[in-house]
């Protein structure tokens, strides 16, 4: 079986796709380079925003045209959009052979392979992907927060934490196969709780793995970010000084309408605690503009917060209603053009701040972990999450190297290995 995977959406989807690759590889399946080589094309989908679903539909349209000329190819849709729309996908694209929702992702590999033959169950699955320096591992699935704009609880289900021993063993296996950095994933990692092991305890157990050099995690919810976690970030050298904490808005009125369960004052207090405990921490965030009821004053509160906090980076999104959510019942009263304007204003301010932050690194020497090389250029990352590029050799991959920074752009640094 030759397979081609197209992944849309968050890092959890990337992790799910990696899981499929590892299982397929264990059974001797091969990754195709393009549609022409594939026996099956797998589309891993996202439902968080309408734009992600439109991207999936566009891709399915292209594959449908290909299948008309190559009827033997199988088309499989998995993930969050598959969970939300289910059989309705086949009504629009009859060429789709199999639909597997996010709640059944653990069975996806065998279901896909059974499109071709049925003797897989007796074989042992090897879940390792070799040679990747940075590896992701899902520590929990689902979400119990029910933010009013978000479809995740409906498509991924309620929170379920994975056995901590299973996680640590998998991380150990990844490190033995070359990983040097592990990124722990969950819709809300701060809610992790398996028996008596909470998230801070899980990080301690993970940090004890020999030869593991870095630990990151995402995504965090402000209402659950604990003092214990901040203490771990301050005292455990393997934990990177980088944290993504979605703010979404700085207007308490909008935060309440979003059902975020915290105030802007609480959020700002967390940032101050983090920066006191971990002075070099880089804080990144998500912001939604144009949420129902967001006035000019509400937006200005958010813009002021961006200027005050000076995030290391941010993702800003224009609100779009998602089916089944509470916000979808609200009047979407911010005109599209105004959403675009607010989006542009926040992005411009964020880019200005980012340039100011990275420009301070010009002339400095940064220790980075070399992750990969392409055309003689090494892609590496600082401990606080900045991407760094430099000319180098393959033998640097997986090692810490020092780079003298010569050029700074919004999201990247460039320099020479010293």
Swiss-Prot record:
Domain MTTase N-terminal: 1-118
Cellular compartments annotated: Cytoplasm
Keyword Repeat included in the entry's annotation: no
Positions bound to [4Fe-4S] cluster 1: 10, 46, 80
Domain TRAM: 359-418
The UniProt record lists the keyword Glycoprotein: no
PROSITE patterns documented for this protein: MTTASE_N, MTTASE_RADICAL, RADICAL_SAM, TRAM
Record's cofactor remark: Binds 2 [4Fe-4S] clusters. One cluster is coordinated with 3 cysteines and an exchangeable S-adenosyl-L-methionine.
Positions in coiled-coil regions: none
Catalytic activity: N(6)-dimethylallyladenosine(37) in tRNA + (sulfur carrier)-SH + AH2 + 2 S-adenosyl-L-methionine = 2-methylsulfanyl-N(6)-dimethylallyladenosine(37) in tRNA + (sulfur carrier)-H + 5'-deoxyadenosine + L-methionine + A + S-adenosyl-L-homocysteine + 2 H(+)
GO cellular component, one term: cytosol
SUPFAM superfamilies given in the database record: Radical SAM enzymes
Pfam families to which the protein is assigned, alphabetical: Radical_SAM, TRAM, UPF0004
Gene Ontology MF terms in the entry: 4 iron, 4 sulfur cluster binding; metal ion binding; N6-isopentenyladenosine methylthiotransferase activity
EC number(s) reported in the record: 2.8.4.3
Keyword annotations from UniProtKB, A to Z: 4Fe-4S, Cytoplasm, Iron, Iron-sulfur, Metal-binding, S-adenosyl-L-methionine, Transferase, tRNA processing
All residue ranges annotated as the Radical SAM core domain in the record: 129-356
CDD domains, alphabetized: Radical_SAM
Cofactor: [4Fe-4S] cluster
HAMAP family per UniProt: tRNA_metthiotr_MiaB
Alphabetized PANTHER family for the sequence: CDK5 REGULATORY SUBUNIT-ASSOCIATED PROTEIN 1, MITOCHONDRIAL TRNA METHYLTHIOTRANSFERASE CDK5RAP1
Subunit structure: Monomer.
Purpose of the protein: Catalyzes the methylthiolation of N6-(dimethylallyl)adenosine (i(6)A), leading to the formation of 2-methylthio-N6-(dimethylallyl)adenosine (ms(2)i(6)A) at position 37 in tRNAs that read codons beginning with uridine.
NCBIfam families: miaB-methiolase, MiaB/RimO family radical SAM methylthiotransferase
Family: Belongs to the methylthiotransferase family. MiaB subfamily.
Name recorded for this polypeptide: tRNA-2-methylthio-N(6)-dimethylallyladenosine synthase
UniProt source species: Endomicrobium trichonymphae
């Amino acid at each position: 079986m030759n397979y081609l995977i197209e992944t849309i959406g968050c890092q959890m989807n990337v992790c799910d796709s990696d899981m499929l690759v590892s299982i397929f590889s264990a059974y001797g399946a091969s990754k195709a380079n393009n549609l022409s080589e594939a026996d099956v094309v797998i589309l891993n989908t996202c439902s968080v925003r309408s734009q992600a679903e439109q991207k999936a539909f566009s891709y399915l349209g292209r594959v449908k045209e290909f299948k008309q000329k190559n009827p033997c190819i199988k088309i499989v849709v998995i993930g969050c959009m598959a969970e939300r729309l289910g059989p309705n996908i086949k009504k629009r694209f009859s060429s789709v052979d199999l639909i597997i929702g996010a709640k059944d992702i653990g069975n996806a590999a065998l279901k896909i392979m059974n499109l071709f033959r049925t003797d897989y169950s007796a074989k042992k699955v090897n879940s390792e992907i070799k040679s990747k320096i940075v590896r992701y591992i899902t520590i929990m699935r689902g979400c119990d927060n029910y933010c009013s704009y978000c479809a995740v609880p409906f498509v991924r289900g309620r929170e379920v934490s994975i056995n901590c021993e299973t996680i640590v063993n998998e991380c150990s296996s990844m490190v033995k196969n070359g990983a040097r950095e592990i990124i722990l994933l969950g819709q809300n990692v701060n809610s992790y709780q398996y028996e008596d092991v909470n998230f801070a305890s899980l990080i301690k157990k993970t940090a004890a793995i020999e030869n593991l050099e870095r630990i990151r995690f995402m995504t965090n919810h402000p209402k659950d970010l604990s003092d214990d976690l901040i203490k771990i970030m301050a005292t455990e050298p393997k934990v990177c000084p980088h944290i993504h904490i979605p703010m979404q808005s700085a207007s308490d009125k909008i935060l309440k309408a979003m059902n975020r369960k915290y105030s802007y004052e609480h959020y700002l207090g967390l940032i101050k605690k983090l920066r006191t405990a971990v002075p070099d921490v880089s804080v990144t965030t998500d912001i939604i503009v144009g949420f129902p009821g967001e006035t000019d004053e509400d937006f200005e509160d958010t813009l002021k917060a961006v200027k005050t906090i000076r995030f290391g980076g941010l993702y800003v999104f224009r609100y779009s209603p998602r089916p089944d959510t509470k916000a979808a019942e609200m009047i979407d009263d911010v005109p599209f053009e105004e959403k675009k304007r607010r989006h542009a204003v926040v992005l411009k301010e964020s880019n200005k701040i980012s340039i100011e932050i990275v420009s301070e690194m010009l002339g400095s020497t940064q220790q980075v972990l070399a992750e990969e090389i392409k055309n003689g250029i090494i892609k590496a990352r600082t401990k606080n999450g900045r991407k760094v590029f430099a000319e180098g050799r393959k033998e640097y991959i997986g090692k810490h190297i020092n780079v003298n920074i010569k050029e700074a752009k919004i999201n990247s640094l460039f320099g020479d290995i010293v």
